[in-house]
Amino acid sequence: MLMGLAVSDQPEGPYRDLRTPWFDPGYSTIDGHLFVDADGTPWLYFSRNGRRDGYDYGTIYGVRLSDDLLSPVGEPVMLLEADQHWELEIRDWNRCNEGPAVWRDGDRYVMTYSANHFMYTGYGIGVARASHPLGPWTKDPANPLAASNPAIGVSGPGHNSVVLSPDGTERFMVYHAHADPAAPSADRVVYIDRLQRDPVSGWWRLHGPTRSPQPAPKG
């Protein structure tokens, strides 16, 4: 599986295919995330997924892109792999980091990502940070950022995008979780919850998952 690149003059489309495949590094690539830094430099983050030694794996890579977005500049660099305890609960058959989303927070870069198998109740979202787009990246020791909560009917929160409120003062995570917690599958429902920075550690915290009404975004 390889990624493609499509463009449009409007977010809602229509989109036209610009390049398919985008590029071929010689392995399967999914979950592409485009991040443009404050200086205009474009970066691509994606997941490499496959199978080795009897288990499925996923690792997160990053690479700088040409200014026209058409080609990688240099070779992709591996940034994250499953290495925290919560990411290795099913290590005998799955060791996965995938679904990266990156944004800039002052002089730091923040990445939110998914870990474990997408149909497993332990599928969740972690957070890491770095001082350069290609790392080294450090994971929050307090991960996961988002996890299943059977008490309120939330199972397997994963993948995500991070967006600002209309007035730019709040961050929100848009992510999905299993539609039926009693029978986890590829069917999902969408959640939106607030992110806030811990004033002591500097790490971002998710106020969720929630299933009750929340205050509207500011602005």
Predicted regions and their residues:
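Carbohydrate-active catalytic/glycan-binding domains of CAZyme proteins
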Residues: 1-219
